């Protein structure tokens, strides 16, 4: 059984990513190369990495804040929207030189066929501003979760 999170103020700090899924059917092999051709019929976006940790804590009833770095891009906007919809207070330091990490998975007939990663590391200046926010937010947290996926947001 999980502990009761309803009264614990949770702060999640770490690497966020957008998990994208393209689902479809494979009916043939490409004539250009020996690879399956996927006819995409459905797509999904889900919070990944530290964003998924924050979403899971919020689902347990905890008031959750997430502190992270994202690019000034569509993927960063999507993550902020998805987390807002899950009642996560999102504090994102947006870096114009950073591509928000995306993990794109292509699924055919219930089998993952391919994963494509889009990622870059955040700037030193953005990390310093995040550190300043962390010091401010720490006093209001009962639980702190550091979620490091090696993308440069923590290490």
What positions do the PLM features span?
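Flexible glycine/proline-rich, aromatic-decorated loop/lid segments
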Residues: 29-32
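Ribokinase/PfkB-type carbohydrate-kinase core domain
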Residues: 1-27, 39-155
